[in-house]
């Protein structure tokens, strides 16, 4: 039992307190163990383990408050370090301080100094001890536990087991190999922590943060494991709303902070009050997580931070009272140790030897007590019964003692017999006690009484020792049972993981099938879309042709009306009704005669349109009788020109006076008839339209008739119903007047029976017709709705596609327009050049004319020969220039023609490109649809895989990438004389470790030489392998593993390390693991390392070629002295425990001109030992590897 250690720290007054007129009200005793608050009303005194004044340095706080806790952690205890106080009292400063590499190192807080202490202890530890350091960082925000290393985990659960205690499930654990790893984890957590600004603090913590550091120590010689957990708790400060000015979310946070702190106070009150039977740990997540730290298995130190100012007098007194109450809490701390099987056997053998010794000693005591009793009996002061009882008891005790020794000998082979042996041994002690009590009952001398007392005390001591040994045996058995239960739990977890993997495989197969089906459906959909687009295009073309034909019909109608008016006006209105008929008929016959050549075509069109129903003779008679009113279209089918000619001659003989106007009108009619022939096809189409309209009207009439028929039918059915009702009523009335029911059948007429049957038939038919009518009505409504939906969908798709096509066509037209403008501009420039050359040519021709005139004047008599020669030379020059210009002009003309041809060719090429672009856009549209479907499926599969990964991460298989390592690797102790081994300590460049083994590359400028001890491998056998050469070990990267990430390198060296683990041979006799390492070891040359392991001969060879020329072969062996593997479940790929590996290091033959630092000597800098377990075969996570990792944890 140990009390919580409480220390108090006061900070200096800040600007706000000085501005409010605050004064220091703190008085600290010279011994620094008590403090007095000079309050406004009364003074308050408090006693603590240590009180730090305002001028205390960070180092003093760490040495007095935190360093003892760290030492307890390294001894195997659980430790907790609380920081409690008002908001703005300096809690975070005490914990973290100011971590500035270039700043004052004295301002560093507890955490960075704690890191130094941990790694100093590791470096000073024995070389046979391996360390595994893990870190996690959580916060309690608004009563929700969040993982600060993985912000996606925002609502973690608290679990509890009897053997394991209380822990938070699902936290991210990062394996630590150096100081920078812990700092990276802390910085990541601090950056993700919830903070806000208040009046009292610019960066006020809005949550309780808990940093958990787990240190596991394994003694390779003995095989024991000690585990210590350190909880660094930075509590959020209690707040007073009037001082902080919290509003909104900040106010809600303050409420939850004060609530959790009040729950913590209630727990402390319940622990310090001896009358409380219940401790309210479950009232808050904070007290639930820190249950072991408050009254449990932990050594706890509480640092209370206070303000010395009178401005915060109430808060300071409340904080001090909290600390004084917490000082009374008692914890039950014990070393968390797991003994190996060898240790348990050694303890068991020791206990058995001590029991044997105690039994022999008991026998001696029994003999001594028997002699004493017999002497007393012979002297006459005792009774015979007493001696007899003592002798009998001694005999019985001797027999029981022999039985106990036999049971103990059997317990070596079977631990189940421990209870029987303990029971027999306890019976021996009871027998001895009975002997002594019997001997005491007899009257003895003073010497005898003293001897008896001494014997009684020795027996009591022996009995206590025996009980202790029995308790230790029980504890050992309990530990064995717990380990077996843990192994079973791990097996169950592995089975669950296997089932999850099978389900994921099934999901992947379903996903493949669905993708194949989707591809087939997409192809079919694309074909249907192409057919739909083709039909739409044809429909639009047909609609355009119909619109054009309608316009042509309208124009033909107007022209026909004009022709009719002209024909009507061509005759003379003053001539009698018979006289003018002759010229008109003759005027019509002439064009009909010309049109007789096409009689066959006209007859076919007339038959199609059903315009002419008369024979040719009837047409002639009608033309003779009614020529004034007949239309030119009706007379087109008259093909007998002879009758027409005769009719025309008769009319001319009777009316000679009207020949001249008739001939003139005849010419006009011929011209009009030609126009009619040209417009005849359009007229035929118009007549077809009129016939269609008639048909539509006929259809409408039929529909109206159908509606009237329907209404009449309904009326008829209603009348029939009324008649039926009347008949029934009449039957009822007639049945009421019947007096004698026996004569009813005789009196009922046969007609009434027939009417009843007819009524029943009519009712049945009516019901059937109604049902049929309703069914047809429903089907029609459904079809209409479906047609409307299809039309709406097609319309929307048409609009969307038209918009896309419009945009594309506009874009192409704009591009074509720009290209066309550029070509036209070029052509215009060339044309302008041609025009300019023609102008120059004209000017030269004018000059030649003037020169010729001058030449003529010169050739006249009296002209000078010199002037003629000069003019002749100028004329020659001009003709040469003209000839050159003509040649250039011809060239330009040919160039213009060529450019025109090129322009036309480019236009054709642009059209072809536009067509191909339209086709490509259609294909791209289809691909986009397919891509969208595939992306949706990919996202769904990705989400399922993320869920599986999250489940795997919960059992420790796939830890999140939080700046630390994902694979556990041990750190070997430095041997007691060496300094801290550093993997990467560079002031010029700091790189975060995110490789597969979370081990960054080594910078030669800042490495500490750490030679290993000479007897590292002497007289010991280990399960780890270490590269004990004058080079620096490079990190290993598991290629093909889910834990593989990129390895950042230092500025001076670039290393790429790959571990290719090939385990394709499942033969149990020979299972080889090849690890090829190709990287730059020591920063010089290309280095290749190969490690091979075979289960056939159980040997491991490490061949490292340094600088391309230096082979180093190092082999190691699995531990045969450590019996930790007894508790492991053997995997098929693991090495048998009986196998041994020979260590045969070869001396490296390194040339003097090659070195790691370029100076000709290999640097003696060494990395910490690299534990590589060669018993695993696959590089990926399998069930066997998961089982082994979980057993180690």
Curated annotation (Swiss-Prot):
Chain intervals with Low complexity compositional bias: 405-429, 643-665, 985-1006, 1044-1078, 1086-1109, 1132-1149
Binding residues annotated for ATP, in chain numbering: 85-92
Region span, Disordered: 377-429, 573-600, 611-630, 638-665, 973-1016, 1032-1114, 1127-1193
Keywords assigned by UniProt, alphabetized: ATP-binding, Coiled coil, Cytoplasm, Cytoskeleton, Microtubule, Motor protein, Nucleotide-binding, Transport
Main location: cytoplasm
GO cellular component term, pick one: microtubule
GO MF terms, alphabetically ordered: ATP binding; ATP hydrolysis activity; identical protein binding; microtubule binding; microtubule motor activity; plus-end-directed microtubule motor activity
Protein name: Kinesin-related protein 3
Organism: Dictyostelium discoideum (Social amoeba)
């Amino acid at each position: 039992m140990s009390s919580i250690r409480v220390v108090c720290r006061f900070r200096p007054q800040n600007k706000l307190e000085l501005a409010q007129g605050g004064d220091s009200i703190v008085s600290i005793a010279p011994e620094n163990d008590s403090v007095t608050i000079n309050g406004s009303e009364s003074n308050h005194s408090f006693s603590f383990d240590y009180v730090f004044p305002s001028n205390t340095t960070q180092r003093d706080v760490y040495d007095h408050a935190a360093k003892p806790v760290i030492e307890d952690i390294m001894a195997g205890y659980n430790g907790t370090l609380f920081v409690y106080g008002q908001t703005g009292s300096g809690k975070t400063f005490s914990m973290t301080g100011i971590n500035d590499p270039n700043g004052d190192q004295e301002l560093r807080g507890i955490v960075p100094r704690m890191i130094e202490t941990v790694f100093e202890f590791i470096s000073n530890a024995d070389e046979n001890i391996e360390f595994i350091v893990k870190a996690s960082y959580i916060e309690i925000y608004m009563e929700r536990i969040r993982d600060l290393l993985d912000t996606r985990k925002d609502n973690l659960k608290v679990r509890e087991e009897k053997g394991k205690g209380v822990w938070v499930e699902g936290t991210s654990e990062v394996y630590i190999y150096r100081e920078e790893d812990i700092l990276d984890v802390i910085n990541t957590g601090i950056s993700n922590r919830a903070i806000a600004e208040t009046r009292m603090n610019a960066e006020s913590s809005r949550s309780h943060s808990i940093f958990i550091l787990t240190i596991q120590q394994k003694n390779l010689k003995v095989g024991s494991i000690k585990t210590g957990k350190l909880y660094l708790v930075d509590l959020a400060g209690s707040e007073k709303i009037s001082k902080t000015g919290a509003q909104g979310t900040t106010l809600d946070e303050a409420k939850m902070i004060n609530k959790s702190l009040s729950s913590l106070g209630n727990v402390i009150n319940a622990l310090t009050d001896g009358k409380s039977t219940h401790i309210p740990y479950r009232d808050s997540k904070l007290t639930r997580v820190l249950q072991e730290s408050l009254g449990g298995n932990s050594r706890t130190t509480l640092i209370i931070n206070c303000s010395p100012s009178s401005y915060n007098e109430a808060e300071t007194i409340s904080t001090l009272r909290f600390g004084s109450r917490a000082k009374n809490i008692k914890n039950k701390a014990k070393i968390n140790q797991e003994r190996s099987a060898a240790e348990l056997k050694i303890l068991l053998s020791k206990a058995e030897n001590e029991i044997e010794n105690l039994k022999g000693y008991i026998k001696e005591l029994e003999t001594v007590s028997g002699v004493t009793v017999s002497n007393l009996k012979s002297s006459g002061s005792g009774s015979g019964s007493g001696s007899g009882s003592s002798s009998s008891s001694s005999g019985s005790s001797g027999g029981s003692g022999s039985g106990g020794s036999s049971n103990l000998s059997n317990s070596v082979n079977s631990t189940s017999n421990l209870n029987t042996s303990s029971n027999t041994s306890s019976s021996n002690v009871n027998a001895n006690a009975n002997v002594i009590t019997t001997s005491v009952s007899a009257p003895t001398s003073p010497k005898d009484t003293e001897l008896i007392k001494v014997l009684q005390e020795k027996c009591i001591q022996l009995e206590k020792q025996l009980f202790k040994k029995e308790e230790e045996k029980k504890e050992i058995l309990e530990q064995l049972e717990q380990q077996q239960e843990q192994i079973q739990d791990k097996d169950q977890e592995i089975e669950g993981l296997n089932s999850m993997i099978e389900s994921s495989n099934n999901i992947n197969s379903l996903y493949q099938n669905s993708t194949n089906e989707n591809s087939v459906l997409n192809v079919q959909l694309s074909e249907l879309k192409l057919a739909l687009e083709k039909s739409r295009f044809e429909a639009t073309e047909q609609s355009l042709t119909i619109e054009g034909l309608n316009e042509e019909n309208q124009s033909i109608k107007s022209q026909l009306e004009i022709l009719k008016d002209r024909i009507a006006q061509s005759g003379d209105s003053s001539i009698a009704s018979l006289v003018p008929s002759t010229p008109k008929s003759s005027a019509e016959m002439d064009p009909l005669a010309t049109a007789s050549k096409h009689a066959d075509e006209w007859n076919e069109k007339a038959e199609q349109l059903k315009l002419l129903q008369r024979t040719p003779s009837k047409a002639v008679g009608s033309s003779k009788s009614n020529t004034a009113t007949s239309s030119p279209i009706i007379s087109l089918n008259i093909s007998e020109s002879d009758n027409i000619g005769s009719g025309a001659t008769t009319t001319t003989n009777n009316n000679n006076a009207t020949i001249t106007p008739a001939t003139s009108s005849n010419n006009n009619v011929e011209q009009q008839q030609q126009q009619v022939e040209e417009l005849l096809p359009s007229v035929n189409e118009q007549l077809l339209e009129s016939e269609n309209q008639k048909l539509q009207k006929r259809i409408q009439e039929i529909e109206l008739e159908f509606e009237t028929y329907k209404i009449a039918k309904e009326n008829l059915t209603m009348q029939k119903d009324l008649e039926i009702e009347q008949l029934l009523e009449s039957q009822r009335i007639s049945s009421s007047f019947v007096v004698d029911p026996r004569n009813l059948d005789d009196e009922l007429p046969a007609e009434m029976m027939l009417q009843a049957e007819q009524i029943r038939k009519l009712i049945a038919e009516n019901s059937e017709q109604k049902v049929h009518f309703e069914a047809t009505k429903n089907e029609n409504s459904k079809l209409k709705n479906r047609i409307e939906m299809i039309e709406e969908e097609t319309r929307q798709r048409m609009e969307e596609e038209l918009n896309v096509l419009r945009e594309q066509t506009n874009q192409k037209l704009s591009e074509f327009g720009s290209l066309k403008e550029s070509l036209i501009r070029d052509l215009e420039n060339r044309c302008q050049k041609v025009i300019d050359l023609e102008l120059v040519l004209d000017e030269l021709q004018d000059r030649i004319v003037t020169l010729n005139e001058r030449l003529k004047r010169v050739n006249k008599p009296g002209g000078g020969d010199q002037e003629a020669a000069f003019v002749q030379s100028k004329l020659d020059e001009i003709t040469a220039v003209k000839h050159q210009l003509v040649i250039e002009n011809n060239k330009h003309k040919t160039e213009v023609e060529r450019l025109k041809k090129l322009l036309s060719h480019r236009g054709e090429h642009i059209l072809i490109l536009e067509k191909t672009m339209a086709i490509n856009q259609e294909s791209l549209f289809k691909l986009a649809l397919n891509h969208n479907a595939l992306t949706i499926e990919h996202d769904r599969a990705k989400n399922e895989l993320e869920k599986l990964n999250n489940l795997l991460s919960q059992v420790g298989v796939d830890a999140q990438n939080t700046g630390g390592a994902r694979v556990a690797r041990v750190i070997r102790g430095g041997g007691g004389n060496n300094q801290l081994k550093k993997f990467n300590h560079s002031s010029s460049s700091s790189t975060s470790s995110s490789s597969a083994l979370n081990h960054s590359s080594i910078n030669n400028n800042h490495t500490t030489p750490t030679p290993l001890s000479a007897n590292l491998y002497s007289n010991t056998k280990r399960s780890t392998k270490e590269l004990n050469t004058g080079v620096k070990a490079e990190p290993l990267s598991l290629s093909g593993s889910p834990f593989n990430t990129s390895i950042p390198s230092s500025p001076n060296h670039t290393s790429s390390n790959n571990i290719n683990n090939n385990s394709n041979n499942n033969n149990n006799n020979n299972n080889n693991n090849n690890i090829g390492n190709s990287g730059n070891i020591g920063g010089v040359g290309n280095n290749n390392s190969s490690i091979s392991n075979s289960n056939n001969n159980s040997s491991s060879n490490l061949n490292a070629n340094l600088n391309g020329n230096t082979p180093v072969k190092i082999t190691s062996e699995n531990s045969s002295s450590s019996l930790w593997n007894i508790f492991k479940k053997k995997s098929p790929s693991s090495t048998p425990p009986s196998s041994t590996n020979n260590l045969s290091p070869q001396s490296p033959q390194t040339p003097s001109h090659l070195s790691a630092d370029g100076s000709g000597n290999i640097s003696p800098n060494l990395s910490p030992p690299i534990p590589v377990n060669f018993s695993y075969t696959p590089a990926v996570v399998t069930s066997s590897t998961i089982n082994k990792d979980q057993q180690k944890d």
